[in-house]
Amino acid sequence: MCAGFYVAVHPWLEAQSLHKVGHTGNLAARLHDGSYTTCFTDEWKYCFTLETSTKKDAQKIEAGVLYCAQFFRVKNKELVCLLPEKIKQLAEDVANCLDISYTLCDSPAYEMNDSTIVVEPSLPSDPLISKEKLRHLVITPVEDEEHFADDVLFFSTDETRTAIEDRLYQKEAANMGYQELRRSGRAILQMACRCGKTRVAYLILSNYLQGKVLYLVPGLSLLRQTLEKLYQYGISLKNVLLVGSDQTRIVLNHDNIEMTTNPVFIAKRIREAPSLLVIATYQSSTLLVDDFDLIISDECHRICGEWETRPFTHVLLNFKKGHRLFLTATPRYDTPLSMKNRELFGGVAFRYYLREGIEAGYVNDFELQMVAAPKLAHQPSTKEETTKQIIVKQIIMALAHLKTNITAPKMLVFTRDIKQAKELYAELVDQGVYALIAHSTLPRQVILKTFTEFCSSKEPVILLNCRLFQEGVEVPELNAVFFAAPRHSPRDIIQSICRPLNKQVQKPHATIFLPLEVNTENVCLDRFSSIIPFADALASEDPRFYEHLLNPSEVAYPINWIGAHGSVSELLQLARHAIRYGTQGKIDRLTRSERLPWKAAFAELKRTVEICCRYPKINDGFHFGGATLRFDTWYKWVIKSYLQYKNKEPSSLEPYQVSDLESLQDWTTRGVGGPYPWEESMAFLETWLAQNKGELVAIDIHQGGWIGLDATPMERLSGVLTTVSQRDGRSYGKNKKLRPKKGFMIPPQQAQDLDRIFGKHNLKWRKDRVNGFLKEDEHGNYTGEPTCIQEAYRTFKEYVKTNPEYIEKYWPGYAKGKHKHQELPHIWEKGLAPPRYKAFKDGNKQLIQRSPKKKDIKN
């Protein structure tokens, strides 16, 4: 007799995707006893068994499986509504956690004879198991929806294969990702959906194929898809190991390969192979051993969540070896275990925006349609019923809008939960709308049938669900998505938006519908609160949308309003105002430094450096998307964040942004340190005085030296000593009122440097004081003995008239106005310099063009 845990199936149960879970001391006889044959036909069979040494061990596995699958168990029955592969993986995980030895048998047939029919001794109905040990294995409905979404792709859609091409951005992503891996051992590639992350991963892992590589994916279908792509790229199957619970053989041309979940075989293969590529599901990752040179985590936002060991976090939290590459379109930052943790995830080494993919032609474009709240003929008695009736009408309005351009549109409706999906479905069907519903509590065959019906429909059709098709499932013909409930997670929002963005020949733009509690009679900013998280998420992926929010008259965007009886333009203006300033309408949320689109702001910084040959000045302005901004504010934020990053402190900058900055000329010296470096200038001053017999000769403390990257040492020293002269003994404020004890404003260390250097030559650099205040007349003019700096400035002014050769040698371009305008002459004359930012007391801001003919370019 053989004891064991089993999962059995009967055609009557299989039709409902139900599977019988049990344990027995006699696997050969179990399916032939009365409890199986009295009410069912003789068609029972095992899906799989875990043979154990004792019946008690088998009972513990059963109890553990039923505990972990509690959300998918039929009440008071040992029936579970999960895929057999899912139950198998769960059973093995339970057995491993409980330290129970077993032998896995797939679809076994045990020989039945008279000797096998034995009355089994009864065991306590509730064996003692450590639920704490198994808590991380509990399957939640949300997790299963995502898992099912991964698997349904394989059964339901065929991906269109295209010729292999290395796009320019893919090469750049691979290079930057690999360099970051070599630098820090961890890197994130954030690339929009459908933009070729797998190809980039292949280009990177090619550098590690002499060793061992692990490629983790969140589901069986993605495992197959990843294998197919890597095979297409040139990976040989002889050095590939697939770890997953689907035993179906995969055939690729003349090659074939199978998955496995045999822990002994897996460990032996990994340890003994000199080179190996392992492709595994996160769910099977507990079977792996820590011996990889590179670990790639695809769709890595799935790892985030609670800080606990579970299949999705097993490798991240427990493996110590190897570099880590994380791939995602939507990083997750809102959970205890999040991608903000740079020790675990590293930083973003490369980013490719959704808008870039659209403009390059790899992703379908889309329009936004906000849907006004319609008036109800009869007011329901409850708020919940009112909301439901309004959303139903808004869904019908959205479908009608699609039908004006598309014969048989398909629309996904994302709901708050399964309860809302059921309620909306019932109401839509009652009103004659062709609607379908799919969610994780339905039998799998029903879901697949519904999904197939939706995909193949030749009529306008709606499919309601909560999270089932939020990501992973591709519907090439999908035309629109409708958010029946607000979403707050940027990840959820962007993944949902991307569902209808498959690129197909002659496919019209997709539509994203956002229902609002707004009509022409109840317009107020609070009514727009539900779209603010949506707008924030979209603006981070689509710089054009961000610019449109700042100035719609200059930057067009496909956004409109349906169901409004008033002025659509006024309603859109209110919506944009709520998004930009919040529902209180007070603070400009979009122009904070960290919100400015990096590519646009960095492009202006790069232009200033490469064209103007300098870094930004304090009063440089920036005109972006209709906003008048002081560029120095963003520039200072960048420097602060850069220094935090280099000091390994929490920083807002990602590695790819740091790489951008360090690509600029003299970034670490002039960009971070400023145009007038103190130590460098003091070294030059000390050498100069030694070579010129202690004479400063001439110095310009009026124009402030020259801030350009090509500045001479004397020009930089002029800037430093201009600052010293301005700070030395400033005792008056702007309104000429005395400010006691605020006289000497030079930092002590810098004062010591000046004392030491000038003191060697008995030169006086400090201004005279009386009782701590400068010697000044009633008009604030200095009346003390001139300092060596002031005397050198007098000489400079004389040399401008009498010794122009000397001036040109040490202050080249002075005669052409370079120092006066702090711009290269040709930059000034052609108006290429950044505009000057000016703020007025009334709150208005102005950018004034720097050129021979000053003119306002923006009020």
Curated annotation (Swiss-Prot):
UniProt-recorded Gene Ontology molecular function terms: ATP binding; DNA binding; helicase activity; hydrolase activity
Residues covered by the Helicase C-terminal domain: 401-553
SUPFAM superfamilies: P-loop containing nucleoside triphosphate hydrolases
Organism superkingdom: Viruses
InterPro entries, per the entry: Helicase/UvrB_N, Helicase_ATP-bd, Helicase_C-like, Helicase_Restrict-Modif_Enz, P-loop_NTPase, Phage_T5_Orf172_DNA-bd
Motif (DEAH box): 298-301
PROSITE patterns, sorted: HELICASE_ATP_BIND_1, HELICASE_CTER
Record-listed ATP binding positions: 191-198
Residues covered by the Helicase ATP-binding domain: 178-349
Enzyme nomenclature, EC number: 3.6.4.-
Keyword tags: ATP-binding, Helicase, Hydrolase, Nucleotide-binding
Similarity comment: Belongs to the asfivirus helicase A859L family.
PANTHER family linked: ATP-DEPENDENT HELICASE IRC3-RELATED, TYPE I RESTRICTION ENZYME ECOKI R PROTEIN
Name of the protein in its database record: Probable helicase A859L
The organism of origin for this protein: African swine fever virus (isolate Tick/South Africa/Pretoriuskop Pr4/1996)
